[in-house]
Amino acid sequence: MRLTKFTDLALRSLMRLAVVRDGDEPLATREVAEVVGVPYTHAAKAITRLQHLGVVEARRGRGGGLTLTDLGRRVSVGWLVRELEGEAEVVDCEGDNPCPLRGACRLRRALRDAQEAFYAALDPLTVTDLVAAPTGPVLLGLTDRPSG
């Protein structure tokens, strides 16, 4: 299975937000974009989607920035990926040139099952799990600002 670049970006953004230490200022979207190595506009779209899912909170103004919500810390990565990827199937059997086998195709069902197995493998994981050592310290090292 292959994730879209958007889902990859959203997950990496969440992972960076998950390692903010006590006393650190919340990160701005621009900082998240720099850390994960994408243009600001791409990061902003991903952050907006994560806000709509309720896993990121954004506050404007002085003392503002991005924070991971409680839901964001405990939600399943499988659920996040399903939400970010949407209803897309592994193969597009309908599209502009519909497959003549689509009504009786066993491959389509097998690919759907494989896709669900992929998501199910991510279900036991949370974003907090993803940033356990050695990942968390590496993420913290990508930000060039002092703690506190």
UniProtKB/Swiss-Prot annotation:
Domain HTH rrf2-type: start-end pairs: 2-132
Record's keyword annotation contains Iron-sulfur: yes
Manner of cofactor binding, per the entry note: Binds 1 [2Fe-2S] cluster per subunit.
Sequence positions that bind [2Fe-2S] cluster: C93, C99, C105
GO biological process assignments: regulation of DNA-templated transcription
A Pfam family: Rrf2
Job description of the protein: Binds DNA; this binding is disrupted by nitrosylation upon exposure to nitric oxide (NO) and also by EDTA and iron chelators. The 2Fe-2S cluster is stable in the presence of O(2).
Highest taxon of source: Bacteria
Entry GO CC: cytosol
Name of the protein in its database record: HTH-type transcriptional repressor NsrR
